[in-house]
Amino acid sequence: MKNISFARIVILWFCSMAGWAQKATLTVDFSKEIGSMQPAWAWFGYDEPNYTYMKDGKKLLSEIAALSPVPVYVRAHNLLTTGDGTPALKWGSTNAYTEDAQGNPIYDWTIVDKIFDTYIERGMKPLAQIGFMPEALSSKPEPYRHHFVPGQSYTTIFTGWTYPPKDYKKWAELVYQWVKHSVARYGQKEVESWYWELWNEPDSPYWGGTVQEYCKLYDYSADAVRRALPTAKIGGPHVTGPAGRRGGNFLKTFLKHCTQDTNYVTGKIGAPLDFVAFHAKGAPKLVNGHVQMNMGTQLRDISTGFEIVASFPQLKNTPIIIGESDPEGCAACGMKTDPQNAYRNGTMYSSYTAASFARKYALADLHQVNFKGAVSWSFEFEDQPWFYGFRDLATNGVDKPVLNVFRMFGMMSGKRVDVKGNFMYPALTVRDSSVRRSTPDIGGLATKDEGTAAVMLWNYHDDDVAGTAATVDLTLKNIPAQKVNITQYRIDNEHSNSYEVWKKMGSPTNPTAEQITELEKAGQLARYGESKRQTVKDGQLIFSTTLPRQGVGLVTLEW
């Protein structure tokens, strides 16, 4: 009898837990400000700079610029790489620097200008990457051009463009001429608003030299930038994950050089450093036939990077830019060759992005650092198969669900305010062990501005498996108005999701014009229900909404 009673208790407990697990509560207190809603999300980047001025590249850049209330910063590789400008995966070129038969420099800014003109025309700002090494300057130029194919080893791409210059003064003159030309073309005030940076991931095979050779190159580059424009902003070093020994040690060595060591050019102590940059990536894998994300890996890189910068008192207020901040490393590795990347077309990429950005802000608060931006290394790949599974924001001119998260961020401004939830994982829990419990992370990020407020909410889990939709009881406290207009937006399988529409079409390899129009419409951010005007009682509103697994919602209030 006792066993039967115990079994019944266990069954009832599991049943109650199953029901409780889907009943989430989120409480937003608009009177408790926790920090500024710095538009750290309004930063994007990609390997292939020549896609910038192509048809779908221009279209996507226009959409990115339109979704943000502030200028968007764009970072691209290969801005000084030698070549004819023909685009390819993980490759790009501008031919900005060549030499004549006598070794005299020849500068040609035609392609670089074409890239930057595309940004400036849209009100965007370059995070101008000084790299990579022109063939004529490389200390080991052959072989130079690589041909990357998805699925092949990364090691094949690290060729002559990765090496230090054979002449540091010629390199410095190239940098000087580029900045000087930029000022002449765009004006001093415009170029003062840019960020100049040196190289990419110099702690990896992207740099064929030593850490000290990088520091030397940085000194020559920074000196050249400042000679051309004394008010220009210069920084680095864009190392890989600081939580790893290699990236962390490189970052520490570089920061020590900039603050304490002798400058290779001036002979004085230190080097200009207007911002510090490092990269942070997650680590998805296949588990029992499904994708399992690892947000914790990315957040540990961010937390360690913040901690390293904060350990230098001179850099306490120096802006930090996470130069690549993504669920994993290779944007040009599609899901067919890398099945762990199958999260990219659907809503898991969206919910991961929402949940991870909230924790980036929380970690910046924890370490008390100046978190300026986090570059989402995702753009578009011209003339590639539909929904191939690249880490991109759009496919063949059609927006993917993840782009709509950034449209949501574009409606959030002012101050971040306190959010608490019974299923919202603490930021340090996500950092240390990711989202691996039996229950999902049902959380929120909320802001308050003059006459407006917004609450982003998500139903995220690392495991990309089907889950029951959650009922979320949302309590909004201390609303400074008596009546508000409430609008909801949604990203899930039925809303803001071109991928699901494409699959329902039969996954056409060559959609018709009518189908493309339908897909473009499905790629836009969709409202969830009708806008409503509601009365606020005692500064408070309470209502419920349903949020599917891996879904993202946004609630906006206007008064």
Feature map (PLM): residue ranges:
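Bacterial Sec-dependent N-terminal signal peptides
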Residues: M1-Q22
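Non-catalytic accessory regions flanking glycosidase/transglycosidase catalytic cores in CAZymes
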Residues: A21-Y195, Q212-P242, G267, A271-P272, ...
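Conserved radical SAM core fold
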Residues: Y51, L80-G83, E135, W199-P205, ...
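A short small-residue
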Residues: Y144-T162, E201-P202, F278-L286, C333-Q340
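Short, conserved phosphate-binding/catalytic loop or strand-edge motifs used
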Residues: W194-N200, G323
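Noncatalytic carbohydrate-binding groove/subsite architecture in carbohydrate-active enzymes
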Residues: V211-F371, E380, Q384, Y425-T429
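Active-site rim elements
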Residues: Y343-T347, G389-G397
